[in-house]
From Swiss-Prot:
InterPro entries: CutC-like, CutC-like_dom_sf. This is PF03932 family protein CutC. One of its GO terms (cellular component) is cytoplasm. GO terms for molecular function: copper ion binding. Belongs to the CutC family. Its main location: cytoplasm. It is found in: Cytoplasm. The gene is cutC. Keywords: Cytoplasm.
Length: 248
């Protein structure tokens, strides 16, 4: 049966995903940045309270995936922390200035991760040549690749996703970006074995008092009275699609 991974930004979201049928969680912070490394406090509390597999993301900032020496040193420390806390896997990715997998740095990450299953995230979609990148990641021993098929969403990238799957059994190709219950069947019919979804939406803050005269963000237009949350019903609906597909 296909595996359902849900992207979560808090312990509450992780518990919601677990209760509604998620098989695995990608744990992140900062949804507006596309997902950054969670704090140590979040890592510890999720590790204590969530029973299903949780793979934290290792990403020190938003933007591109070509990191300074200082940023990369911090990434290695975060990898070691995730390993020490007992997580079964992690999610990360590093590119060089030419849009290739940074082999030297990824080798260091793989060594620091040890037995943990490593997912190469959507830095893959920013690679100059996805097929060369896939071969490099296979040689490194990366467990899976999260990809939208180098398109803005995985529906439009499905032809490339299918080509990547046809390259071999490893790494596993996990489709993500815009995957929802209403289009999930297309991925299952195409032979995708793992799917990734945020399965959520922005929700209004419970704050009653709101000072609209200033912003804590460098983006003055940012809505600071909203937060991203996993929708349990959406997770359950996606799981139902997978179960029904397996039964047919």
């Amino acid at each position: 049966m296909a595996l359902l991974e849900i992207c979560c930004y808090s312990m509450e979201c992780a518990l919601t995903a677990q209760q509604n049928g998620a098989d695995r969680i990608e744990l992140c912070a900062a949804p507006k940045e596309g997902g950054l490394t969670p704090s140590l406090g979040v890592l510890r509390t999720v590790r204590q309270h969530v029973a299903i597999a949780v793979h934290p993301i290792i990403r020190p900032r938003g933007g591109d995936f070509c990191y300074t020496d200082g940023e990369f040193a911090a990434m290695l420390e975060d990898v070691r922390t995730v390993r020490e806390l007992g997580f079964p896997g992690l999610v990360t990715g590093v590119l060089d200035v030419d849009g290739n997998v940074d082999l030297a740095r990824m080798e260091k990450i793989m060594a620091a991760a040890g037995p943990l299953a490593v997912t190469f995230h959507r830095a893959f979609d920013m690679c100059a040549n996805p097929f060369n990148a896939l071969k490099n990641l296979a040689d490194l021993g990366v467990a899976r690749v999260l990809t939208s098929g180098q398109k803005s969403d995985a529906v439009h990238g499905l032809p490339i996703i299918m080509e990547l799957i046809a390259q071999g059994d490893a790494p596993i190709i996990m489709a993500g970006a815009g995957v929802r219950s209403e289009n999930l069947q297309r991925f299952l019919d195409a032979g995708v074995q793992e799917v990734h979804s945020s399965a959520g939406a922005w929700q209004a803050s419970p704050m009653r008092y709101r000072n609209h005269g200033l912003s804590m963000s460098t983006d003055a237009q940012a809505d600071e009275y909203s937060r991203y949350a996993v929708d349990g019903a959406a997770v359950a609906e996606m799981k139902g699609v997978i179960v029904r597909h397996q039964a047919n």
